[in-house]
Amino acid sequence: MSLNVDIGLGTYDFSKWGYIDVHKIKEVHIYDFDNTLFQTPLPNANIWSNQAIRILMAFNILANGGWFFDPHVLAATGDGVEVEEKRAWEGWWNEKIVSQARESIRRPDVLAVLLTGRNEGFRGIVEKIIASKGLDFQGVVFKLQAPDGFWPQTLNFKLWFFNEVYRHFLYINSTRIYEDRPSHIEAFSAWLTERKKKNKNADFEIIAVAEPPKYLKFKVEIALVRGMLTAHNLKAPSLKLPLYKFVKNVIATVVTVPVAELHHIRNAFFNIPIAEIMESVSANSSRRNSHDSNSTIICEPEYPPDTSFNSSPGRLWIVTAIGRYRDEYWTVRAEAAEGYDCEKIHEIDVADIPSLYGTILYVSMSTGIVKSEIGDIGAQQWKTLAPSERWILRTNIRKECTYDIRYKRPYVSSLKYSDDDLTAGRASPMTGPTKRK
């Protein structure tokens, strides 16, 4: 991997951060914002169809750029900005990471930076959120646009910024990065390892952050998405994009995993011990009255109040290997638990389970919806679990009424795109081209 990342941005202007004595800075601690420091809400899988979630999460389908490009989503978090600012968005933070950030900010030898892939349009709301928590980073960095209108991919932008930090702060000998996206964690590790080959004193640590997803209130989310579709449809004709409509009561049958299981898969992928998994689940869960005082349950996101659903008895699987497919799905190799003594799955001589075979489940990172197959299977990265690491995974079959987003009228695109267009850098209606011609 090359250490030089040319994205057409020139050099970063650190002078706007105020005076910093570069001779005193020995370490840099870089914090990601979304789902790392702050638990940004995701589209609720219990409300939307799979197609609707795909439309909302994509950056280049809706004219406003989708869920993570619309400042209204952050503004709608909890009970809204006016209420949440007074209570510092309580309950929406990863408090362990907040504590680490406070320590980084306190130390005079550390450059503490908040680095996000969001653009400058989010500066107002993001700075309001972190200020309410009393987090005074030396720098809050948003993705920049090149003079020619080019928007770099978030990963390349962050790597470019790392280089700029090392160029300006010459005495840094240690880097610590807090990040939640698996592909970024892997790329940062490879890039920093390559840097360490040329500079033996360039130590680094990457903290993989894994927290259960959080969601907006049902009525807030419905109103928000309706507004996003209205805004899109006003701009769509001039951008030659299709019009979309909100559709209610779509019957669907889906296979899902509970939120707690989604959290477990994520932590297992990042090699976080089981004890820490359960501690993290406990810290981010709502306790319900139970005969077992030690029983902790993660509350599932709320369902539409005016629609019904029913859940079939779940199926149990013995997880033998895990991996990922891009930043979209966790991949799970599993054996049906029927026929095995589940209490003995950790014993090597008893649980003779083929770890490289069995059923492959694709579990959506953001929603927990399970698919049985994906077209391009070459993008998987597998980690075989030792017997002591195996666990019993439950999947549920649910028939429900959900909401959907569909074409407002028949639409035939004049251009043909493949599923690889997202990673190939197709233009975003909001941000313009993501790669140079």
From Swiss-Prot:
<feature type="modified residue" description="Phosphoserine">
    <location>
        <position position="418"/>
    </location>
</feature>
<feature type="modified residue" description="Phosphoserine">
    <location>
        <position position="293"/>
    </location>
</feature>
<dbReference type="GO" id="GO:0000452">
    <property type="term" value="P:snoRNA guided rRNA 2'-O-methylation"/>
</dbReference>
<dbReference type="GO" id="GO:0003723">
    <property type="term" value="F:RNA binding"/>
</dbReference>
<dbReference type="GO" id="GO:0032040">
    <property type="term" value="C:small-subunit processome"/>
</dbReference>
<dbReference type="GO" id="GO:0005634">
    <property type="term" value="C:nucleus"/>
</dbReference>
<dbReference type="Pfam" id="PF10307">
    <property type="entry name" value="HAD_SAK_1"/>
</dbReference>
<feature type="modified residue" description="Phosphoserine">
    <location>
        <position position="290"/>
    </location>
</feature>
<dbReference type="InterPro" id="IPR018812">
    <property type="entry name" value="SAK_HAD"/>
</dbReference>
<feature type="modified residue" description="Phosphoserine">
    <location>
        <position position="428"/>
    </location>
</feature>
<dbReference type="GO" id="GO:0031167">
    <property type="term" value="P:rRNA methylation"/>
</dbReference>
<dbReference type="GO" id="GO:0000494">
    <property type="term" value="P:box C/D sno(s)RNA 3'-end processing"/>
</dbReference>
<keyword id="KW-0597">Phosphoprotein</keyword>
<dbReference type="GO" id="GO:0008649">
    <property type="term" value="F:rRNA methyltransferase activity"/>
</dbReference>
<dbReference type="GO" id="GO:0031428">
    <property type="term" value="C:box C/D methylation guide snoRNP complex"/>
</dbReference>
<dbReference type="GO" id="GO:1990259">
    <property type="term" value="F:histone H2AQ104 methyltransferase activity"/>
</dbReference>
<protein>
    <recommendedName>
        <fullName>Uncharacterized protein C4.02c</fullName>
    </recommendedName>
</protein>
<feature type="modified residue" description="Phosphothreonine">
    <location>
        <position position="296"/>
    </location>
</feature>
